[in-house]
Amino acid sequence: MAPGLVVGLNKGKVLTKRQLPERPSRRKGQLSKRTSFVRSIVREVAGFAPYERRVMELIRNSQDKRARKLAKKRLGTLKRAKGKIEELTSVIQSSRLAH
């Protein structure tokens, strides 16, 4: 933000910043509709992995810390484990609402 001064730390000509189109790399990690649809179909057909079923059972029995520890052991990092716990908790809640 140059104020048009000739000297000083903020010196320089006043310009309007160019609006550049967003780079494709900025989309990295963002889920597309197609990908989310395919994942939902796979989840429907294949079901849950054995460790996921065990984690869900632990969550149902309100052993959240144990469930987190198991998920971390299986997935490698606590961040991934927290995401998985969140996903499985939402699955449990939606199944409760369905019945």
Swiss-Prot record:
GO terms for cellular component: cytosol; cytosolic large ribosomal subunit; preribosome. One of its GO terms (molecular function) is structural constituent of ribosome. Disulfide bonds: none annotated. It is found in: Cytoplasm. InterPro entries: Ribosomal_eL36, Ribosomal_eL36_sf. Keywords: Cytoplasm, Ribonucleoprotein, Ribosomal protein. Pfam families: Ribosomal_L36e. GO terms for biological process: cytoplasmic translation. Component of the large ribosomal subunit (LSU). Mature yeast ribosomes consist of a small (40S) and a large (60S) subunit. The 40S small subunit contains 1 molecule of ribosomal RNA (18S rRNA) and at least 33 different proteins. The large 60S subunit contains 3 rRNA molecules (25S, 5.8S and 5S rRNA) and at least 46 different proteins. There are 2 genes for eL36 in S.pombe. Belongs to the eukaryotic ribosomal protein eL36 family. Component of the ribosome, a large ribonucleoprotein complex responsible for the synthesis of proteins in the cell. The small ribosomal subunit (SSU) binds messenger RNAs (mRNAs) and translates the encoded message by selecting cognate aminoacyl-transfer RNA (tRNA) molecules. The large subunit (LSU) contains the ribosomal catalytic site termed the peptidyl transferase center (PTC), which catalyzes the formation of peptide bonds, thereby polymerizing the amino acids delivered by tRNAs into a polypeptide chain. This is Large ribosomal subunit protein eL36A.
